[in-house]
């Protein structure tokens, strides 16, 4: 049994690259770090967290990581063995992704002469953009240990982002009837696109933090016309009491809040893992 649900995401070529390879090497030798929120229940399930939020990881590599983790977990399940949940959080270099049934009619360019790489993936939904300044979360979790309900899972992912925007940035975001994702007015702040196989999830959500939204002009994001995309930085700068924060500060704040709220919403104990484990 395999399900796919429409996805979409968000971008920012403005992100500086000066926090990349040195941090990547540090992650490879870092020790496991536990993140646990006091509001979680007494014995929460463990979730291994591959935290690469300050790095630009090529889409193809992250996609391969997800499928590798997914296959490992499915093999354990087939043997009736327990497996922990997993989460990858990162940024991507500029890239467009499409779902299995995506239409090229939503591309405002010739796919043979695309401005960035274009990947067609297993997820549902239409074309979207990922890029620097957008935090992407890929949960690979066993819904048998949570709730075997795709709508429940989607609403929980939305809840994570709504909480982050409210608690970290005082932004009042909400759901929009008939659409998946998180919105402020008619601006989509976060896109959600998942695939579920044997009740194991992959793909996930993307939150525009300091994202340069220009590349969205080259597509019809998620196939939704007459609605725009937004970013945390853009909304903060438009606010009445704007206090200038550097892009890296905004990303740090959003990252910390995403992990905290994900831990609370899904009642998981986050345990940071080294990148080396992904590449073994």
UniProtKB/Swiss-Prot annotation:
Matching Pfam families: LplA-B_cat
Organism lineage string: Eukaryota, Viridiplantae, Streptophyta, Embryophyta, Tracheophyta
Organism: Arabidopsis thaliana
NCBIfam families noted in UniProt: lipB (TIGR00214), PRK14345.1 (NF010925)
Pathway as given in its UniProt record: Protein modification; protein lipoylation via endogenous pathway; protein N(6)-(lipoyl)lysine from octanoyl-[acyl-carrier-protein]: step 1/2
Residues marked Lowers pKa of active site Cys (site): 188
Entry EC no(s): 2.3.1.181
Protein name (record): Octanoyltransferase LIP2p2, chloroplastic
PROSITE patterns: BPL_LPL_CATALYTIC, LIPB
Classification via HAMAP family: LipB
Transit peptide region: 1-34
């Amino acid at each position: 049994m395999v399900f796919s649900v429409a996805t979409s995401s968000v971008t920012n070529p403005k992100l500086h690259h000066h926090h990349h390879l040195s941090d990547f090497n540090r992650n490879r030798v870092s020790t496991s770090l536990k993140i646990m929120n006091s509001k979680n229940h007494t014995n929460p399930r463990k979730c291994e967290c591959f935290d690469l939020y300050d790095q630009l990881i090529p889409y193809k590599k992250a996609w391969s990581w997800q499928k590798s983790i997914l296959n490992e977990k499915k093999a354990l399940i087939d043997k009736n063995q327990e497996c922990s949940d997993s989460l990858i959080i990162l940024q991507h270099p500029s890239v467009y992704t499409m779902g299995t049934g995506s239409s090229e009619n939503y591309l405002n360019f010739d796919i043979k002469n695309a401005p960035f790489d274009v990947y067609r993936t297993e997820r549902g939904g239409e074309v979207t953009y990922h890029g620097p300044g957008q935090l992407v979360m890929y949960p690979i979790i066993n819904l048998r240990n949570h709730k075997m309900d795709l709508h429940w899972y989607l609403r929980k992912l939305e809840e994570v982002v709504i909480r982050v925007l409210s608690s970290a940035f005082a932004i009042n975001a909400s759901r929009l009837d008939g659409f998946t994702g998180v919105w402020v007015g008619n601006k989509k702040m976060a896109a959600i696109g998942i695939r579920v196989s044997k009740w194991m999830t992959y793909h996930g959500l993307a939150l525009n933090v300091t994202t340069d939204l220009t590349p969205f002009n080259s597509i019809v994001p998620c196939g939704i016309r007459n609605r725009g995309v937004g970013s945390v930085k853009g909304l903060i700068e438009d606010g009445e009491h704007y206090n200038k924060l550097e892009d890296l500060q905004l990303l740090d704040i959003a990252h910390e809040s995403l992990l905290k709220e994900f831990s609370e919403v899904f009642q998981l104990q986050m345990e940071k893992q080294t990148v080396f484990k992904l590449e073994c």
